[in-house]
Amino acid sequence: MTAQLKKDTWTDVCQLDDLVPESGVAVRLGKTQIALFYWPKTGEVFALGNTDPFSSANVIARGIVGDVQGKRMVASPLYKQHFCLETGQCLEDDAVSLMTWPARLEEGQVLIQQP
């Protein structure tokens, strides 16, 4: 899926039906790959950079989601580092984090805010 980049706006990147509950889906926004995670119990969508900072591979959307230290997280499928879904912070290395974007659901669409 590819969406056009619009500065300072909310951009429609996919439909809610395209997301898999408690799992990841990758989308492209301009030249940027973003991993989306949908938490149906709370109705939240999380948008993180899809590039694993330890391997430079675009694989975060394929990671396993769960709970570590009371935080919802995704584990990189390559080297297994855990990243907080809310902040993108690596739980094993405070110096490393994934980019994050504000995300929301609106009328069955998934929107990401561009800075």
Model segments located where?
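Rieske [2Fe-2S] iron-sulfur-binding domain
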Residues: V25-P115
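A boundary/linker detector
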Residues: M1-D12, L16, V20, P115
